[in-house]
Amino acid sequence: MNAIHGSFTPPHLLNNRHSPTRNIYPSSAMTGRKRKADDDGSSDDRMSASPSISSAELPRQQPRHMKRMRTNLSGRPLPLPRLLETLSADEMRNLLQSICQRHPDIGNEVVSTAPRPSIQSTLEVLSKYESAFQSAFPFGGRASSDYAYNRVRQQLIELLESLKDFTPHYLPPNEQQSATSLAFLDGATEIIHRLPNWDTYQHNRHKEEAYEEMAKAWAIVFREAAKKAGGIQLQYGGWDQKIAKHNEHSGGKMQEAVNELRGGLGWMGADAPAPAASGPEDAMSIRQQLLSGNYGMGSSASIGAW
């Protein structure tokens, strides 16, 4: 039997034979369809199906504008501007006064650079002293009794001392405007009018001395105002009526100021026309009484509401 023997080539000597090319990647069409199918699902489904960690475990990035706490934080005193913000007006005043007393040069600088107090602010301070004085009166009993005087004596002295300190500030030459000086004196004199008349005569010396000092202050301002523009401010300011009212209310203790004003307006006396007499009951005007020196004599002057 004939046998056919074929020749075989060893495998390693064979030419490289590649198997048919197979596309291991899905076709573009299938890829598009797969992506579209994935897109149709909700994001929640994809997230739930994903094996990734939950959002709570993900580190969150802090906003960039937030400041990080200092790692070297330690206790320290407040900066001066922050400390001053926490002080009340009384605490600030006491602190500044204490510093100025220990360092006179600082006190002089404060006096020279501080704004000038206004009439309103000054009268408000005096009003606080007056309110403290009124609040110190005991309940019940007579307000003019010795017991009441002993209860309010300290507050009374503080009120009168504040008047003595503030009044020179509004007098010339420190205050050049006569209108400003007179306006302050008008308000300060009203405070003295409201002080009680005590049963014991010796207790009234505080009020008597206050009237004397206030009368001198009025006289100084009248004297200086008469030198400016011929005293025209005194003529048209109505101060003749106001000082006459104060003198009447004080029981004649402002007479020195009345006399000074009379002298300042004396240059007008010769040219002043006589008032028209509409009847025997008509009294002379206050200005005419001041010029003639007859104020308070005879019938009382009609000054109207003031």
UniProtKB/Swiss-Prot annotation:
Residues 36-47 have a biased composition (Basic and acidic residues). Gene3D superfamilies: Tethering factor for nuclear proteasome Cut8/Sts1. The keyword Ribosomal protein does not apply. Keywords: Cytoplasm, Nucleus, Protein transport, Transport. It is found in: Cytoplasm; Nucleus. It holds the Pfam family Cut8. Belongs to the cut8/STS1 family. This is Tethering factor for nuclear proteasome STS1. It comes from Phaeosphaeria nodorum (strain SN15 / ATCC MYA-4574 / FGSC 10173) (Glume blotch fungus).
